[in-house]
Curated annotation (Swiss-Prot):
InterPro entries: Ribosomal_bS20 (IPR002583), Ribosomal_bS20_sf (IPR036510). GO terms for molecular function: small ribosomal subunit rRNA binding; structural constituent of ribosome. Residues 1-44 are annotated as: Disordered. The lineage of its organism: Bacteria, Pseudomonadati, Thermodesulfobacteriota, Desulfobacteria, Desulfobacterales. Signal peptide: none annotated. GO terms for biological process: translation. Residues 1-11 have a biased composition (Basic residues). Belongs to the bacterial ribosomal protein bS20 family. It comes from the Bacteria. This is Small ribosomal subunit protein bS20. Binds directly to 16S ribosomal RNA. Keywords: Ribonucleoprotein, Ribosomal protein, RNA-binding, rRNA-binding. GO terms for cellular component: small ribosomal subunit.
Length: 83
């Protein structure tokens, strides 16, 4: 339990941010999985799914959920795997 008001507030803010980041990260990972399964299945919509996954990865980096370099690496490897 926090000893100060400010510590309690920070704990509350941290928890809210953690949940927000978890949601963003989860949707990003789901999009990446959809691209990989579409690639393995050989469906035509893999490039559309790739574009949406790229967008979600870039948004996660912009929000600070993941580092910019991590986002670039994920996008690069995902694009390379389809090519």
């Amino acid at each position: 339990m926090a000893n100060h008001k400010s510590a309690a507030k920070r704990a509350k803010q941290s928890e809210a941010r953690r949940l927000r980041n978890k949601s963003t990260r989860s949707s990003m990972n789901t999009a990446v999985k959809k691209v990989r399964t579409a690639k393995e299945a050989g469906t035509d919509n893999a490039t559309d799914l790739l574009n949406s996954a790229k967008s979600l990865i870039a948004k996660a980096a912009k929000k600070g959920v993941i580092h910019q370099n991590t986002a670039a690496r994920k996008i690069s490897r995902l694009t390379k795997s389809l090519g």
